[in-house]
Amino acid sequence: MSKEDAIEVEGVVTESLPNAMFRVDLDNGFNVLAHISGKIRRNYIKILPGDRVKVELSPYDLNKGRITYRLKKK
């Protein structure tokens, strides 16, 4: 999957699971299982339940995604 093919959506982390996996409720109403991207992991950015995040979804499997960005709190 190339980066251009990925679908990028925003959502809210609802649950933290083992092995750096998270359950994310997307703005369009879907619920996906997401893992942390390498850059977030390398820079020690903490993701907690309640955080707004950007998630990349593969067009082949819309139930799994990758968290690419944690949005700022207002």
Curated annotation (Swiss-Prot):
Its main location: cytoplasm. It is found in: Cytoplasm. Pfam families: eIF-1a. Coiled coil: none annotated. One of its GO terms (molecular function) is rRNA binding. Residues 1-72 form the S1-like domain. Keywords: Cytoplasm, Initiation factor, Protein biosynthesis, RNA-binding, rRNA-binding. GO terms for cellular component: cytosol. The keyword Protein biosynthesis applies. InterPro entries: NA-bd_OB-fold, RNA-binding_domain_S1_IF1, S1_domain, TIF_IF1. Gene3D superfamilies: Nucleic acid-binding proteins. Component of the 30S ribosomal translation pre-initiation complex which assembles on the 30S ribosome in the order IF-2 and IF-3, IF-1 and N-formylmethionyl-tRNA(fMet); mRNA recruitment can occur at any time during PIC assembly. One of the essential components for the initiation of protein synthesis. Stabilizes the binding of IF-2 and IF-3 on the 30S subunit to which N-formylmethionyl-tRNA(fMet) subsequently binds. Helps modulate mRNA selection, yielding the 30S pre-initiation complex (PIC). Upon addition of the 50S ribosomal subunit IF-1, IF-2 and IF-3 are released leaving the mature 70S translation initiation complex. Belongs to the IF-1 family. This is Translation initiation factor IF-1. It comes from Synechococcus sp. (strain JA-3-3Ab) (Cyanobacteria bacterium Yellowstone A-Prime). The gene is infA.
